Amino acid sequence: MSGSSGTPYLGSKISLISKAQIRYEGILYTIDTDNSTVALAKVRSFGTEDRPTDRPAPPREEIYEYIIFRGSDIKDITVCEPPKAQHTLPQDPAIVQSSLGSASASPFQPHVPYSPFRGMPPYGQLAASSLLSQQYAASLGLGAGFPSTPVGKSPMVEQAVQTSSVDNLNAKKLLPSKVTSATQLNGRQAQPSSKPASDVVQPAPVHTQGQVNDENRRPPRRRSGNRRTRNRSRGQNRPTNVKENTIKFEGDFDFESANAQFNREELDKEFKKKLNFKDDKADKGEEKDPAVMAQSEETAAEEDLLGPNCYYDKSKSFFDNISSELKTSSRRTTWAEERKLNTETFGVSGRFLRGRSSRGGFRGGRGNGTTRRNPTSHRAGTGRV
């Protein structure tokens, strides 16, 4: 590296030529001896500038916030300007941050170190080693120095450098939203401002204790309401095109053959003939045929088997013979009897019936918001059973 040995290189304006014969100018920010990289801030590419190369590159107007150069791909480094003298406060641990007036040419100097993505800190506050810059980047979660994602689109630049433009930096949103310093990107002085930057992500709103408590109480009610909605709508969202198992019939139903098996009229006629024949024989006192007697005995035996306690006989009727109120009592029960039966069955109900004492009990006055008690309504609506 050319330049006098006593020149403080950090903060100096550096002219760097890569092996691709492309010249860059920027401010030296850090030299990483472990990774063999050099980082420049506020970098501009001047192209190949008539240097002999197979792939010439034109100059570019963009100013990059930073570019990290690989040491093995650097051809020459020249110090163009030494760092400007910085008139800063002494390193006092009692100072949290400071700001000069608008008449001063020195920008706002925060005491807390940060990365040079949004304006570099004064180089008088930096040490000459790369360890300090690594600590800055580590505090922002940026690894050893800077992000390693190459952004430069030129094939010449991609071989030797890793770049990031201002637009790409704005897209990444790496900085806090509140900018309370007067740091500027183009060298012009700006007033201290506490307004949020337009290209930075806005912070989450700070909730007070009352708001946090309200937010902690409200979601369970929403979830319970949604649960009730789901319970009410259960079964309504079922698909309507579900096909049930249907029975397929090959032909029409034969009613004649089915009725022949269950011909109720013929069975009733035969049964009546047997009863009438037996009654006639008994009335006339005629001698009974032994075959008829045997048949009548079988019928009587069948009736005895059924017995008087046979409450249901499907051959005789669909209905049973269990006693009911229609058979036992011919008259309707009165309201008092039904109430007595309910009391014996379910017990005594509550003494005060709901809603009786509220009939005419209170009447609101018009306009004054007062209430008036009706003296007769309380006696009329005692609610006694």
UniProtKB/Swiss-Prot annotation:
Highly expressed in oocytes (at protein level). Residues 241-277 form the DFDF domain. A motif (FFD box) lies at residues 310-326. The modification Phosphoserine is found at S106, S115, S154, S165, S329, S349. The modification N-acetylserine is found at S2. InterPro entries: DFDF, FDF_dom, FFD_box, Lsm14-like_N, LSM_dom_sf, Sm, TFG_box. One of its GO terms (molecular function) is RNA binding. The modification Omega-N-methylarginine is found at R351. Residues 219-235 have a biased composition (Basic residues). Belongs to the LSM14 family. This is Protein LSM14 homolog B. The lineage of its organism: Eukaryota, Metazoa, Chordata, Craniata, Vertebrata.
